């Protein structure tokens, strides 16, 4: 931006002249182009305004492409070796096949390289993005820069992206590596991800489309983009195509088809052409309506006159070309363009160099553009193809041909055809009037009537044909001519050059690129054009530099200093925060800034400044009798009256220049004399009125000149007044800053006082003034001034914030009338209070508008006292420094600080240069390492998990009778489908080990099995099975210690090989006889429930008992091996063996203990008989042994013996005893122990009550109580009325009111509290604390408990507590002051109590347990959801037979189920329930609607079912929003199903009318899950309703669940919920665990409680902070092992403080960021938001946990949102740990 532009008027009612601007970017000539009047006109031409490309041959821009074309470059070469390496390793045959596959073509050297950090993409995500996405993203950015569009400015715009794509090599590479598939790979490798990634990164709101039309894809994309623009669907289009050759598959296909040349070269039109060379790269063009482009000052590169797309229909083969189709599509494009074929000068052909394709295409093009067009033989049409230069880019080929055609039109030349030696003899070149150039050809000179035109053809092997017609822009030559008239390097006017980068380390490279370009083009460029390009048409990133330069050599030298990080006074640098700085505020300072030649330079060189001076000259002449112009030219005398007037003139003149460069201010303030200019610039006065005030007052000052003096003293105004005391003749005139003020008064008095204070060590500096400004000595001038101004001033309301330094309230809106200026003259200047108000209002950027800075230091000091935020205070001019450069430097400082200067609006017609260097990329390799073995080869070396054994690759050991099986075991290939945890470690079930033995041996018999050490699944380990004719052994070792010599191999299990002729002891069992002698019928779930009770939380296999009978020593169970058809099992045997070992361990259920099998005497299987899915398992105790030993037999349903497991012995695990482990660790209730009281109570200077009812009788009592304690208070009906800025220690107490309707009470109170929090956070009032008072008895207020807990988690800095009080007329000050960090406090017996989870105690036997009767009906809301259907299935297995499933959605008519909806999973679930014997009614009733209760009653009467005995309310929706974002609509939508639904059920089924009333709530509210404000409120209401019904004698209970694995919130695809659970200190549970917990609660009658909290606390690390206080009594942790001399990070042993602590924390936090994002620590920018570095929601949770475990301090769920950068986090933890 240049300081020499002409003037602009202030944004005020000031008088002035119109702006004078430089000429606009040409675009005025539209001859030959249709410019429609209507935006939606379908006839509109489309302009190409930007292009970018990256191709082989090191082509990285259209300019470098043109140079490459001119030299007939051929970029063909060999495939980089690493590309196909994963395929070479996948199969032994692949190496030979790849050797036969063409490995030559046109390749990018750095296809794996990408600048992920620039786009804030984490390395983890970057490597999962197809290189095509990365390439397209970078090239699209370059194309926008080439178009002169700053990409960030498109955010939210109707900009579309159309990208052609046809290759999915990377997707195949990644997605076929199944064990390593990751969530990011979906969009990361999809075709749609290529345009969508661009739209996402740039925040574009227009269409985003990927097109696959094979090799025509990118030209088809351009066609659709053009159509969308013409139809008005989009304003701007990014169109192009991309191709990457990463796998051998398609190359092999094309080899087989004979389409590829053996040497990988393209030879279009050449006799030797025998196929094409595949190529990779990307091309992008930017399209806009021509009329809009001209209006926006864009450079029109060419006009896209017409385009067409078609198909070649049915040919000899789908890949065979069709000349007629190619001809027709060309004619269609010409018709669209409305130009004749003979006007086309050049055709860019598809020309794939195939023997059939080239002649076919050339003949078709000749028919259209050659001889068939009727053109003269002397005017042939030139034809060419870019493919021999850069290869056939397939999906990117069309757009690259288009870019070449645009370059041909712009240069008026056709480059020579590469790789053309002998013309193809199959083409009639002598007759067709098409000419492929051998040398550079210059096209005929175009004219306005006959502009140059070109056509582009592109075809796909699938049959798509496309064509485009281009025309040279008629204004191009005019533009070039006018650009040449712009002054170049010798223009002396200074300019501002802006460079920036998203990270600090990039700035040097950006500066280096610009320096090199300037050096190479010094003689031909205009520095002004470079300035406007950088300011208006480039993105402005976080790290900013601004250079003030007045010549190209000056700029080059400054850029060199930037590159070297050398100091330079005209180089400004800064980094901005994540949001734009608020401001700027212009400060007009007062008397004292003057110097003799202060305005001379500006008057001579700035038209804007000169205009101000000439406007003021007549007034100054008339009013004070001297010439301002003459004074500027000769020098300003040191006379107070002249200084006053000239200072005002300088203020307005500098402001005029500054507004041209940086735009208008956001606010203004004047200091003393400066208030006059502030009034003018704000619009409160015209410039004439401002001049009258200053001139007439200056004239009066002449009476007092020489009678006064002023001195700056380094003490505060308050101290100065105390020191002055009763001394006369001296007053405090200016309150400048907290440590300084200005004294004014009589000359002698000032001198005496100054001398005395200096002797006392106080700094005193005399001010250049001989008038006693701002003292009572001026009172005699008051009346004359008032009279002289009365009637002359007509003050207005300012048009921007105007602060006062004359009024006690700096925000006073008093009009600037005559009385105001009297006050301004006499009263002290309150600069300090005005600056404090500016800081309080959030302004952080301030500019001192003066000829020399005199208040900057004071302003910096005051701002520093008011805020810890970064602050900018900059001068506009400095004495004896170049004025224009100084003002530009101020603009540069504002920009670098982060003020949003709209440069393009300041000078919209400024010329610009697209050749200015674009973004410099900092590439790093990102390429996903995949498993280099195929699925088949993996099976050769590892076990098959679905075989449910550990047999890997079989190796016969030569020279021995031994056989070895070896495998690699890890979590991903565990040989069982479920989970089998033991003390937190996943172990291989004994059944799998036994099956492994049986599978390895030919005689299916093993004996003397010893199960010695469990085989642990994770971490990964090697497993070997060795056997000979006598023994078989399983051994294992961790992968990292797998050498045989180091003794790390464990013997896990051994056995002897059984004899070949061993058979079961019996062939058949009489099952009917067994049933008769086993009289005790057990529940089908008996074994599972028992095992759960002793600590087995999950099963390795999905077997299920369907019939179970027993006696004291014997059991018979009918078992289904796989009732739900779970995958992961090739047969049923191992699942049934697992059932056998599990069920037989329950024979000793009367002595409960977790028992594991330790040995087996013999296992024998009848291998001739296939194992059915359903078997009977017979277990009997072996009485002759002291151990727990059983014999087990598996039989078919007819009694045929299938297997015997004889003498299986069990032993209890060391330290295990019966304690109902599973449910005691799972089922809890909330108890309320006394709260700990702090020693340093909170102090409140004021308490503000907020309540809808200000007549609430409690208020009078509370205020009386506070009056007695001398604490002030106030009452407010709305949060917006709170006095947040008036008190430093404010307590806000919300008193919710009760309304007639319970739902209205709940929603109103929650909305009120949300509004309070939003108001306080918006005001950034961190010293305010919020409390809520309830009596705990009002049902509608119970929702507030859940909301309060979420607020505590999200805003712990302002949350006090929700307090349930006993005495509603006594303010609970003790709890408010002495209990800290509590979300909810309950006062009972006068004691503040806090919530803690404790195990649910057993209840008395008199309570009714939960039972399901076949004769009753049960109702489930949310019944068609996954949770509801799972509950329904469990209830049916427990005896329920009649179910009502309520849901908001209706199922299709049952008559259509069998035909159309058999794959509907909901319908399948219902049919499964019916197969189990249940009658299911699905009722489409939205239970939250007002009429739901009556509708449900009516439906129940109609169905005529047995009475409803139990209700489960499981309906609900989730809409996560932070409290700051919650709206009333969202809150009500989430609360309705929970609260209205529950109340409707409460109405239909009143208390004591049911066997049970179960409400599904959530534990998320207790643990403060962020974002769940609405959901938590609804769930807390359910808890309150259960409490209310229980109080009325009902068997109601609220179950506060953790997530159910795989259901509801437990289905988070990206693992966010699992990570959040872990962060909060708990885990999810399986549905089986949920039902066992429910059964446990029901079996105790709920323990007499109205709720049960069903969670499992995870085991914490030794030094890990407790994730939430509510877990205090149930959390367990591992012992912390610390080596001697070591201390945990963040522990009190590390005695650091100050800068040492800050550096330690920065290192720790950077390490955690590095670990989370997989980024190097030296690449982390501590000022960049972690989200902008690519940290998503799941990573954020993991980062919090890493941080918490490293620092050993709690890290709240919203801390990362409030402290978004490393810088913020360091500051936060420094304060916390220092405290």
Curated annotation (Swiss-Prot):
Alphabetized Pfam families for the sequence: Acyl_transf_1, CurL-like_PKS_C, ketoacyl-synt, Ketoacyl-synt_C, KR, PKS_DH_N, PP-binding
Domain Carrier per the UniProt entry, residue ranges: 1703-1777
Region feature Disordered, mapped onto this chain: 1-40
Pathway listed: Secondary metabolite biosynthesis; terpenoid biosynthesis
Application notes: Yanuthone D is an antibiotic against C.albicans, methicillin-resistant S.aureus (MRSA), and vancomycin-resistant Enterococcus.
Compositionally biased intervals (Basic and acidic residues): 31-40
Region (C-terminal hotdog fold): 1079-1219
Annotated catalytic residues: 215 (for beta-ketoacyl synthase activity), 350 (for beta-ketoacyl synthase activity), 392 (for beta-ketoacyl synthase activity), 672 (for acyl/malonyl transferase activity), 980 (proton acceptor), 1138 (proton donor)
Biological processes annotated in GO: fatty acid biosynthetic process; methylation; secondary metabolite biosynthetic process; terpenoid biosynthetic process
Effect of a null allele: Loses the ability to produce yanuthones D and E.
Positions of the PKS/mFAS DH domain: 948-1219
Biased composition (Polar residues): 1-11
Recorded GO MF terms: 3-oxoacyl-[acyl-carrier-protein] synthase activity; 6-methylsalicylic acid synthase activity; fatty acid synthase activity; methyltransferase activity; phosphopantetheine binding
Keywords, in A-Z order: Methyltransferase, Multifunctional enzyme, Phosphopantetheine, Phosphoprotein, Transferase
Enzymatic reactions: 3 malonyl-CoA + acetyl-CoA + NADPH + 3 H(+) = 6-methylsalicylate + 3 CO2 + NADP(+) + 4 CoA + H2O
Keyword Transferase attached: yes
Protein name: 6-methylsalicylic acid synthase
Species name: Aspergillus niger (strain ATCC 1015 / CBS 113.46 / FGSC A1144 / LSHB Ac4 / NCTC 3858a / NRRL 328 / USDA 3528.7)
């Amino acid at each position: 931006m240049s300081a020499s532009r002409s003037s602009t008027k202030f944004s005020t009612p000031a008088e002035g002249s119109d702006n004078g601007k430089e000429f606009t970017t040409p675009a005025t000539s539209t001859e030959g182009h249709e410019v429609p009047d209507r935006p939606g006109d379908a006839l509109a031409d489309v302009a190409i305004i930007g292009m970018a490309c990256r191709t082989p041959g090191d082509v990285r821009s259209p300019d470098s492409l043109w140079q490459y074309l001119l030299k007939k470059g051929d970029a063909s070469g060999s495939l980089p070796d690493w590309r196909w390496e994963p395929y070479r390793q996948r199969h032994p045959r692949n190496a030979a096949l790849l050797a036969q596959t063409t490995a030559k073509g046109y390749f990018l050297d750095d296809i794996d390289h990408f600048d992920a950090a620039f786009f804030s993409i984490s390395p983890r995500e970057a490597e999962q993005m197809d290189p095509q996405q990365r390439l397209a993203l970078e090239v699209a950015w370059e194309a926008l820069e080439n178009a002169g569009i700053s990409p960030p400015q498109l955010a939210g715009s109707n900009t579309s992206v159309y990208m052609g794509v046809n290759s999915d090599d990377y997707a195949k590479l990644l997605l076929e590596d199944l064990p390593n598939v990751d969530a990011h790979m979906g969009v990361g490798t999809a075709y749609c991800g290529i345009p969508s990634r661009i739209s996402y990164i740039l925040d574009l709101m227009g269409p985003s489309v990927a097109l696959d039309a094979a090799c025509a894809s990118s030209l088809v994309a351009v066609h659709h983009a053009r159509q969308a623009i013409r139809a008005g669907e989009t304003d701007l289009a990014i169109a192009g195509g991309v191709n990457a050759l990463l796998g051998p598959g398609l190359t092999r296909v094309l080899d087989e088809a004979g389409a590829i040349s053996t040497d990988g070269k393209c030879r279009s039109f050449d006799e030797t052409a025998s196929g094409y060379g595949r190529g990779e790269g990307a091309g992008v063009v930017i399209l806009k309506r021509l009329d809009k482009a001209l209006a926006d000052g864009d450079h029109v590169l060419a006009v896209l006159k017409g385009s067409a797309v078609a198909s070649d229909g049915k040919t000899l083969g789908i890949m065979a070309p069709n000349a007629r189709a190619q001809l027709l599509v060309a004619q269609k494009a010409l018709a669209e363009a409305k130009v004749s074929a003979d006007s086309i000068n050049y055709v860019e052909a598809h020309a794939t160099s195939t023997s059939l394709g080239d002649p076919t295409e050339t003949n078709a093009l000749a028919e259209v553009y050659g001889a068939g067009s009727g053109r003269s033989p002397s005017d042939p049409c030139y034809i060419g193809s870019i493919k021999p230069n850069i290869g056939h880019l397939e999906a990117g080929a069309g757009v690259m041909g288009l870019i070449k055609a645009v370059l041909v039109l712009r240069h008026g030349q056709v480059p020579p055809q590469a790789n053309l030696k002998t013309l193809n003899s199959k083409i009639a070149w002598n007759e067709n009037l098409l000419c492929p150039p051998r040398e550079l050809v210059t096209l005929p000179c175009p004219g306005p009537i006959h502009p140059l035109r070109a056509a582009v053809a592109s075809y796909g092997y699938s049959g798509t044909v496309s064509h485009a017609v281009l025309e040279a822009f008629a204004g191009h030559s005019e533009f070039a001519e006018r650009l040449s008239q712009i002054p170049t390097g010798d223009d002396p006017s200074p300019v501002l050059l802006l460079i920036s980068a998203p990270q600090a380390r990039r700035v040097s490279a950006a500066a280096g690129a610009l320096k090199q370009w300037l050096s190479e083009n010094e003689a031909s460029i205009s520095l002004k054009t470079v300035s406007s390009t950088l300011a208006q048409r480039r993105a402005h990133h976080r790290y900013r530099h601004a250079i003030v330069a007045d010549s190209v050599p000056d700029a080059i030298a400054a850029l060199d200093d930037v590159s070297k990080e050398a100091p330079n006074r005209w180089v400004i640098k800064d980094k901005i925060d994540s949001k734009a700085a608020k401001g700027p505020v212009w400060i007009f300072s007062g008397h004292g800034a003057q110097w003799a030649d202060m305005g001379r330079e500006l008057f001579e060189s700035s038209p804007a400044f000169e205009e101000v001076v000439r406007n003021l000259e007549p007034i100054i002449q008339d009013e004070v009798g001297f010439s301002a112009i003459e004074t500027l030219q000769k020098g300003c005398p040191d006379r107070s009256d002249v200084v006053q007037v000239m200072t005002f003139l300088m203020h307005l003149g500098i402001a005029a220049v500054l507004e041209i460069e940086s735009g208008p201010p956001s606010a203004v303030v004047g200091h003393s004399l400066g208030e006059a200019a502030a009034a003018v610039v704000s619009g409160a006065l015209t410039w004439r009125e401002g001049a009258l005030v200053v001139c007439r007052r200056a004239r009066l000052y002449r009476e007092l000149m020489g009678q006064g003096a002023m001195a700056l003293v380094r003490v505060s105004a308050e101290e100065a007044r105390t020191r002055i005391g009763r001394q006369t003749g001296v007053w405090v005139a200016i309150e400048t800053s907290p440590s300084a003020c200005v004294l004014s008064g009589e000359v002698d008095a000032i001198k005496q006082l100054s001398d005395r204070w200096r002797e006392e060590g106080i700094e005193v500096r005399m001010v250049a003034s001989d008038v006693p400004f701002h003292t009572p000595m001026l009172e005699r001038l008051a009346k004359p001034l008032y009279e002289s101004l009365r009637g002359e001033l007509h003050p207005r309301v300012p048009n921007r914030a105007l602060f006062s330094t004359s009024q006690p309230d700096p925000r006073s809106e008093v009009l600037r009338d005559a009385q105001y200026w009297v006050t301004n003259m006499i009263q002290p200047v309150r600069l300090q209070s005005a600056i404090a108000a500016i800081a309080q209002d959030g302004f952080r950027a301030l500019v001192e508008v003066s000829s020399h800075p005199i208040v900057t230091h004071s302003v910096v000091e005051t701002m520093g006292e008011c805020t810890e935020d970064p602050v900018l205070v900059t001068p506009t001019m400095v004495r004896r420094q170049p004025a224009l450069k100084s003002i530009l430097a101020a603009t540069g400082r504002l920009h670098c600080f982060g003020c949003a200067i709209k440069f393009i609006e300041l000078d919209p017609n400024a010329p610009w240069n697209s050749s200015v260097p674009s973004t410099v990329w900092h590439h790093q390799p990102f390429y996903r390492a995949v498993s280099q073995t195929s699925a088949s080869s993996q099976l050769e070396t590892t076990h098959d998990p679905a075989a449910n054994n550990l047999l890997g690759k079989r190796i016969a050991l030569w020279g021995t009778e031994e056989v070895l099986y070896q495998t690699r075991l890890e979590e991903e290939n565990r040989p069982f489908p479920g989970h089998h945890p033991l003390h937190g470690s996943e172990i291989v079930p004994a059944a799998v080990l036994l099956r492994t033995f049986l599978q390895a041996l030919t005689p299916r018999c093993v004996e003397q099995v010893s199960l010695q050490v469990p085989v642990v699944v994770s971490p990964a380990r090697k497993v070997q099975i060795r056997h000979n004719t006598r023994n078989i052994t399983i051994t294992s070792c961790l992968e990292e210690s797998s050498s045989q010599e180091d003794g790390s191999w464990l013997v896990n299990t051994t056995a002897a090989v059984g004899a070949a002729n061993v058979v079961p002891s019996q062939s058949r069992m009489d099952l009917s006889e067994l049933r008769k002698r086993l009289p005790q019928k057990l529940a089908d779930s008996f074994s599972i429930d028992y095992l759960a009770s002793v600590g087995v939380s999950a099963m390795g296999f999905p077997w299920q008992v369907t019939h179970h009978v027993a006696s004291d020593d014997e059991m018979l169970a009918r078992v289904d091996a796989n009732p739900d058809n779970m995958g992961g099992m090739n047969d049923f045997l191992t699942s049934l063996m697992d059932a056998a070992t599990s069920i037989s361990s329950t024979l000793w259920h009367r002595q409960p203990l977790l028992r594991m099998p330790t040995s087996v005497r013999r296992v024998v299987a009848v291998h001739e008989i296939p194992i059915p899915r359903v078997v009977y398992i017979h277990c009997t105790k072996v009485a002759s042994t002291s151990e727990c030993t059983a014999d087990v037999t598996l039989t078919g349903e007819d009694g045929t013996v299938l297997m015997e497991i004889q003498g299986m012995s069990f032993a209890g695990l060391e330290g295990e005893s019966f304690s109902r482990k599973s449910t005691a660790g799972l089922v809890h209730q909330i108890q309320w122990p006394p709260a700990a009281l702090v020693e340093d109570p909170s102090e409140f200077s004021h308490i503000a009550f907020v309540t809808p009812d200000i007549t609430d009788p409690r208020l009078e009592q509370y205020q009386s109580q506070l009056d007695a304690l001398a604490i002030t208070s106030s009452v407010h009906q709305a949060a917006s009325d709170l006095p947040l800025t008036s008190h430093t220690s404010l307590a806000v107490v919300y008193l919710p009111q009760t309304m007639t309707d319970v739902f209205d009470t709940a929603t109103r109170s929650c909305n009120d509290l949300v509004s309070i929090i939003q108001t306080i956070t918006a005001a950034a009032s961190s010293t305010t604390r919020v409390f809520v008072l309830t009596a705990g008895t009002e049902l509608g207020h119970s929702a507030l408990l859940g909301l309060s807990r979420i607020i505590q988690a999200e805003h712990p800095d302002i949350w006090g507590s929700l307090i349930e009080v006993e005495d509603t007329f006594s303010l609970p000050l003790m709890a408010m002051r002495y209990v800290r960090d509590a979300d909810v406090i309950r006062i009972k017996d006068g004691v503040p109590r806090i919530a803690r989870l404790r195990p649910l105690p057993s209840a008395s036997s008199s309570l009714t347990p939960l039972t399901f009767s076949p004769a009753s009906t049960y109702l489930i809301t949310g019944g068609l959801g996954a949770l509801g259907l799972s509950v329904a299935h469990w209830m049916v297995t427990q005896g329920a037979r009649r179910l009502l499933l309520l849901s908001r959605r209706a199922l299709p008519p049952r008559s259509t189920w069998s035909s159309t909806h058999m794959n509907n999973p909901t319908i399948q679930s219902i049919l499964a329930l019916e197969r189990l014997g249940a009658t299911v009614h699905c009722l489409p009733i939205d239970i939250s609607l007002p009429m739901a209760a009556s509708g449900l009653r009516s439906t129940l009467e109609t169905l005529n079912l047995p009475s409803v005995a139990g209700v489960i309310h499981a309906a609900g929706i989730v809409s996560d929003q932070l409290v700051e974002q919650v709206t009333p609509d969202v809150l009500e939508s989430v609360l309705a199903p929970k609260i209205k639904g529950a109340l409707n059920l409460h109405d239909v089924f009143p208390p004591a009318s049911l066997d049970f009333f179960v409400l599904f709530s959530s534990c998320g509210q207790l643990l403060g899950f962020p974002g769940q404000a609405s959901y938590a409120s609804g769930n807390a209401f359910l808890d309150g309703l259960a409490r209310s019904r229980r109080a009325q004698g009902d068997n109601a209970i609220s179950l506060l669940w953790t997530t159910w694995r795989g259901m509801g919130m437990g289905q988070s695809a990206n693992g966010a919920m699992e990570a959040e659970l872990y962060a909060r200190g708990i885990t999810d549970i399986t549905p089986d665990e949920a039902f066992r917990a429910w059964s446990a609660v029901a079996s105790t009658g709920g323990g007499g409680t109205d709720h049960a909290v069903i969670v499992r606390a995870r085991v914490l690390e030794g030094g890990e902070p407790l994730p939430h206080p509510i877990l205090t009594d149930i959390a367990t942790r591992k012992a912390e092992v610390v080596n001697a001399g070591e201390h945990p990070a963040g522990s009190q042993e590390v005695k650091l403080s100050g800068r040492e602590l800050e550096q330690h924390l920065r290192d720790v936090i950077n390490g955690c960021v590095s670990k989370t994002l997989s980024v190097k620590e030296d690449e982390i920018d501590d000022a960049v938001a972690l989200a902008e570095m690519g940290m998503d929601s799941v990573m954020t949770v993991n980062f919090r946990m890493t941080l918490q475990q490293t620092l050993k301090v709690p890290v709240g769920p919203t801390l990362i949102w409030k402290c978004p950068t490393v810088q913020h986090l360091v500051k936060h933890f420094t304060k916390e740990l220092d405290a």
